[in-house]
Amino acid sequence: MGKIEAKNIEKFFQHDGKPLKALGGVNLTVSDGEFVCIVGPSGCGKSTFLRILAGLEKPDGGEIMLDGKKLADTGPERIMVFQEGALFPWLTVRDNVEYGLKIAGIPEKERKEISNRYLDMLSLIHI
């Protein structure tokens, strides 16, 4: 993927008519191949920060860079796994597994091979 950088990320919300700082000058650099966990108590801004990294929310200050290029919107190079269930209820189990692959332009035959491997691994192949 490459190196992703968050530089001086700020985010404010309104609370009782006053600005409430959710994120204040957050900086993070994650190089290709690194594995990072963001931990903290409920309400400290973890999800807000991840939503900004994924392009689902805009910061009130700062910028997100991918390989030195400023990111402005969502894109296929970024994803987010949500805390709550995020299945599409109108799709089958297989179609849910293949959804991201389809969006990424993976051919149908290859999608089936990939989904078969993981559905079998989880004993869900017959669902």
Indicate where each model-derived feature is located.
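Short beta-strand immediately N-terminal to the Walker A/P-loop
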Residues: V36-C37, M80
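Conserved ABC transporter NBD signature motif
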Residues: G62-T74
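Helix-to-loop junction immediately C-terminal to a conserved catalytic motif
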Residues: A54
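A short, flexible loop at the N-terminus of ABC-type nucleotide-binding domains that lies
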Residues: M1-A6, F12-G25
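Conserved small/polar residues in nucleotide/adenosyl-binding loops
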Residues: C44, I125-I127
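Conserved ABC ATPase "signature" region
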Residues: K102-I125
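The feature captures the beta-strand-to-loop junction immediately N-terminal to the Walker
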Residues: V39-P41
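Short coil-to-helix segment of the ABC ATPase nucleotide-binding domain corresponding to the Q-loop/switch region
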Residues: L91-E98
